[in-house]
Regions:
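Flexible coil segments in periplasmic/lumen-exposed cytochrome c-class electron-transfer proteins
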Residues: 26-38, 67-96, 128-171
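A structural feature that tracks compact, well-ordered secondary-structure segments
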Residues: 103-113, 120-126, 139-141, 154, ...
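Aromatic/His-enriched, Gly/Pro-containing loop or helix-boundary segments
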Residues: 36-43, 107-110, 115-117
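Acidic/histidine-rich, surface-exposed loop or edge segments in extracytoplasmic proteins
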Residues: 95-104
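Electrostatic cytochrome c docking/interface patches
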Residues: 32-56
């Protein structure tokens, strides 16, 4: 009787794992046709100053989107650092995630994307190509539109840094 229960339990586990695998593989590269918020960046100095405050403070952009640990420490100490990305975080069995270049560089940064694409990424986690990104670690979906505009306006005001970073690697 115990052997029969264990076999049934094992069958349920195998079917569950198979179902999870099929779900993930069928939705992994799914394209989302979800429009970004109809927002536009600003060149107003007060908006950019608000963006700088958010990027270097509550939004924690400088805690990850730097090139290494030394820059993280410098940013946390109040120094200005380039938000050129490149820090790789090991995500255990999921794979690894490398932070993106947030400077307005047209080759490797956000300069190659429209405002709508950036806002959509921040608000909904949808990449410019329409695929889902790794779940965002910061809750930008709750951020007020005015603050989203301020953050991206500040990022657009930074000097561009051409710094190509690795793509995320999923296992």
């Amino acid at each position: 009787m115990l052997k029969k229960i264990l076999l049934i339990l094992l069958a349920i586990i195998v079917v569950g794992i198979l179902g999870l695998y099929l779900y993930i593989s069928s939705s992994w590269n799914k394209k989302y046709d979800w429009p970004g918020p109809a927002l536009k960046t600003s060149t107003d100095s007060a908006v950019i100053a608000r963006g700088k405050y958010l990027v270097t403070g509550p939004a924690h952009c400088v805690s990850c989107h730097v090139s290494g640990f030394a820059d993280m420490v410098a940013a946390d100490s109040g120094y200005t650092v380039d938000l050129k990305g490149g820090v790789t975080f090991q995500m255990g069995p999921i794979g690894s995630l490398t932070t993106r270049n947030l400077t307005p560089d047209k080759n490797s940064g956000i300069g190659r994307y429209s405002d709508e694409q950036i806002f959509r990424m921040m608000r909904h986690g949808i990449r410019p190509d329409g695929t889902a990104s790794m779940p965002l670690l910061m809750p930008f979906w709750n951020m007020a539109d005015e603050d989203l505009v301020a953050v991206v306006s500040y990022l657009r005001s930074l000097p561009p840094v051409d710094h190509k970073v690795d793509d995320a690697h999923y296992t």
